[in-house]
Amino acid sequence: MASSVRLVKKPVLVAPVDPTPSTVLSLSSLDSQLFLRFPIEYLLVYASPHGVDRDVTAARVKAALARSLVPYYPLAGRVKTRPDSTGLDVVCQAQGAGLLEAVSDYTASDFQRAPRSVAEWRKLLLVEVFKVVPPLVVQLTWLSDGCVALGIGFSHCVIDGIGSSEFLNLFAELATSRAKLSEFQPKPVWDRQLLNSAGRTNLGTHPEFGRVPDLSGFVTRFAQERLSPTSITFDKTWLKELKNIAMSTSQAGEFPYTSFEVLSGHIWRSWARSLNLPAKQVLKLLFSINIRNRVKPSLPAGYYGNAFVLGCAQTSVKDLTEKGLGYCADLVRGAKERVGDEYAREVVESVSWPRRASPDSVGVLIISQWSRLGLDRVDFGLGRPVHVGPICCDRYCLFLPVRDRMEAVKVMVAVPTSAVDRYENLMRSPYS
């Protein structure tokens, strides 16, 4: 039976504690792209110290939120479409971020496994209680064992993963009074014009936006079949073994592979094989690549808007399944190496109005690397989180940090129920 979650206080809007500019800010072309019209939703679970005062903790979180919204005041605004529909703006009038407090009969140990369904943990972030959902919503949920879950939702068009982690670490530092607001680095930087369209017309080929034939009923299957969440942890030893396998099966690997290259390749290959797709079906692996230091000049420290493009590895089911892990890792490496300043600028042009390019879903697996964001360091005075993950585990594959295991990675993704057993077996059998 599903565990219950119940609000114990009326939802509130928390405004910045000090006056902030009343203005309308334009989001960048990357921010405004159609692909990012969804929230980033984190779930952090803390083993609360014995005897913690709930009222004091909740008040401390609320006060810290109000203080952190002063430098990050756009998160207290509201996103709207421009009158000419060319992009998005943030109307900043200190409307406030959402804050909720709840109780649940979940325990911290419930989050050490994969959820039973895609939306099992949905009520740990009840954004729908707000008539207009703010760009930032925080929900503090007290668990039955005395631990606490913190659900945080960001509007992805306002902030990316790196930016959200910088905000959360400031928020947490202010909650514990470990740092003064004036001392915190890096200072948040708006400067969204740095990633706007420059009106280029001669653009290169970008496979992430290309369409491939659906030879397998791929879209229908993922839309209609129940998806089952999975969670598998790869430790340092296992990752080293994947690197060895990749080197032994590669035709081009001259340099040692990174953990990301081999793990992404292994997941992609296992996922494809488990779905039993036609040999000629073209598949794509998409993953985010931070461009803060790839564009010229580099973006300023503290830039918290969307500053990533999608790397794209592409091949057929036949080649992906028959050519081994080294081949897959080479495709991932090649996709990373293609991204430089020119490539990133072309993506900006491609997603801008009126082109508005967006990835298709046919044959696509998307990976997002949360394990390197620093979410495992977000400490509100309750210690470091014992679990870091998403509110909902869906078809986006997430790399997550594992507490006290620096080089380990937890992989969460939901796959069609008919394929889940084979997927998990293949993931645990890298030599197969």
Curated annotation (Swiss-Prot):
GO terms for biological process: alcohol metabolic process; fruit ripening, climacteric; response to ethylene. Disulfide bonds: none annotated. The active site is at 156 (proton acceptor), 379 (proton acceptor). Keywords: Acyltransferase, Transferase. Its EC number is 2.3.1.268. GO terms for molecular function: acyltransferase activity. It catalyses: 2-(methylsulfanyl)acetyl-CoA + butan-1-ol = butyl 2-(methylsulfanyl)acetate + CoA; ethanol + acetyl-CoA = ethyl acetate + CoA; butan-1-ol + acetyl-CoA = butyl acetate + CoA; butan-1-ol + propanoyl-CoA = butyl propanoate + CoA. It comes from the Eukaryota. Signal peptide: none annotated. Gene3D superfamilies: Chloramphenicol acetyltransferase-like domain. It is an enzyme of class 2 (transferase). This is Alcohol acyltransferase 9. It comes from Actinidia chinensis var. chinensis. InterPro entries: CAT-like_dom_sf (IPR023213), Plant_acyltransferase (IPR050898). The keyword Chloroplast does not apply. Involved in the biosynthesis of volatile esters which confer kiwifruit flavor. Alcohol acyl transferase that can use a wide range of alcohols as substrate to produce esters. Exhibits acetyl-CoA:alcohol O-acyltransferase activity. Belongs to the plant acyltransferase family.
